[in-house]
């Protein structure tokens, strides 16, 4: 069921992300993700433009003749599916490349919000954590890849592949964007992937709203060059206001597989 309060909060955190990238003290941590984002996006966009025509022809070959009168609508859905698959490729690559820098940005945003240091060793501590960060990105890829493959296989089914699959792909992409960017502040506190995923699922409308806005802005020229640090800043604010108090002191306690909340406590301290 759609939760209007979570819908508003998801929008709020996205908007606040734009506010924080301009704050003094954070700008130098924003520059590197923007530069990496620009180089990677330009390269993949060139590849996408050079291959889009062949990809569309390939997808349209699966549409039977008796659905020819719907070809224009089905073509639009096919293009949407291809765009989302392109987006998934982009976010996966950018996640691996920019993970250390995004983790550092999330750390600095949290320090600005709370006044507390997460790591005391500065750059040395970040370098030490790079293998763990890359392992975390691999964990996210293992979670998402089987679902992407399933959606890809479903796209071969006539009509279903051109109507239902694009919608499911978009929703899954929104969910993955929430996971991708919220994971940086969670991972800075070494909260496990499963606990993080369950916690976000407990406020699914908020997560999907935030992830949906990030997804849509990725397709807007110029804005898409800034969206990575914006999403990291907004996700960190979401962590601080919704999950930080309830999770960071309870990481060693058992959590419900359905809700991600501490099963030994009726009040987890999560701020609504």
From Swiss-Prot:
Q: Which domain of life is it from?
A: Bacteria
> Listed GO molecular functions?
high-affinity sulfate:proton symporter activity
Annotated localization: Cell inner membrane
Q: Where is the signal peptide?
A: none
- Where would you say this protein principally sits, based on its record? membrane
Transmembrane helix: is it a keyword of this entry? yes
Which keywords belong to this entry?
Amino-acid biosynthesis, Cell inner membrane, Cell membrane, Cysteine biosynthesis, Membrane, Sulfate transport, Transmembrane, Transmembrane helix, Transport
Which stretches are transmembrane?
29-49, 66-86, 148-168, 219-239
Q: How does it sit in the membrane?
A: Multi-pass membrane protein
Q: HAMAP family from the entry?
A: CysZ
| NCBIfam families tied to this protein | PRK04949.1
Q: Which family does it belong to?
A: Belongs to the CysZ family.
Q: What is this protein called?
A: Sulfate transporter CysZ
Q: Which gene encodes it?
A: cysZ
């Amino acid at each position: 069921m759609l939760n209007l309060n979570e819908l508003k909060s998801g929008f709020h955190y996205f908007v606040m992300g734009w506010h924080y990238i301009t704050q003094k003290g954070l700008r130098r941590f924003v520059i590197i993700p923007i530069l990496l984002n620009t180089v990677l996006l330009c390269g993949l966009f060139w590849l996408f433009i050079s291959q889009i025509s062949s990809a569309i022809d390939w997808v349209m070959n699966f549409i039977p003749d008796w659905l020819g009168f719907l070809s224009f609508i089905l073509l639009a859905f096919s293009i949407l599916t291809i765009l989302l698959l392109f987006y998934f490729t982009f976010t996966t690559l950018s996640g691996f490349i920019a993970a250390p820098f995004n983790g550092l940005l999330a750390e600095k945003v949290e320090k600005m919000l709370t006044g507390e240091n997460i790591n005391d060793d500065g750059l040395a501590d970040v370098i030490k954590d790079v293998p763990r960060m890359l392992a975390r990105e691999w964990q996210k890829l293992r979670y998402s890849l089987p679902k992407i493959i399933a959606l890809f296989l479903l796209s071969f089914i006539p009509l279903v592949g051109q109507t239902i699959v694009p919608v499911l792909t978009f929703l899954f992409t929104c969910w993955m964007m929430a996971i991708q960017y919220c994971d940086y502040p969670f991972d800075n506190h070494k909260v496990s992937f499963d606990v993080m995923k369950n916690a976000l699922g407990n406020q699914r409308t908020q997560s999907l709203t935030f992830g949906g806005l990030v997804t849509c802005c990725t397709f807007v020229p110029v804005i898409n060059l800034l969206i990575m640090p914006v999403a990291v800043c907004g996700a960190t604010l979401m962590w601080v206001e919704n999950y930080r108090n309830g999770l960071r002191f309870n990481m060693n306690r058992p959590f419900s597989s359905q809700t991600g909340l501490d099963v030994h406590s009726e009040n987890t301290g999560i701020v609504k």
